[in-house]
Amino acid sequence: MKNYRTYTYLSFLNIIFFMTPFTSAHSLEDAINSQDRSPKNVARDQYRNPYKTLSFFEIKQDMKIVELSPGSGWYTEILANYIHSPGMLTAAHFDKNSDRDFYIRMRNNFEKKINENPMYKNVSIVDLSSKLADRETLDAVLTFRNLH
């Protein structure tokens, strides 16, 4: 009888496991508090209030988002940990072929950051001047701290 109960229990768990949609366990708080974030960026949380900001914009894990001019990727660190399939995160950065050294340096540093950490495996990068996406396919376009 004991083996019957064990098999029944394991079968039940197996059904639950395979019928449950695969979603991230990460909440927005988990993404903000992730160990993957740089300590330098975490130190600025108290001033930038990422939880309040992203909650205000009603950003959800399954959204398709374009982040305009992500700079060095402060918000990208959080969004990359939070946005999961079927959602997507596209970073629209300075053009690779710009004639401005600053733009090229910023883009190269951002690409290096994205390519060196598996946390960013689902982040795509496009040129800011290119067609970012069809309007109908996006849930949000975000821009932070770059309009002065």
Regions found by a protein language model. Name each.
Residues 73-77:
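Glycine-rich SAM-binding Motif I of class I
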Residues 28-56, 60:
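Class I SAM-dependent methyltransferase Rossmann-like catalytic core
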Residues 2-12:
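Bacterial N-terminal signal peptides that target proteins for export
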Residues 61-71:
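Conserved class I S-adenosyl-L-methionine
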Residues 131-141:
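A short acidic, Gly/Pro-enriched loop at the edge of an enzyme's catalytic core
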Residues 10-20:
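Bacterial N-terminal signal peptides
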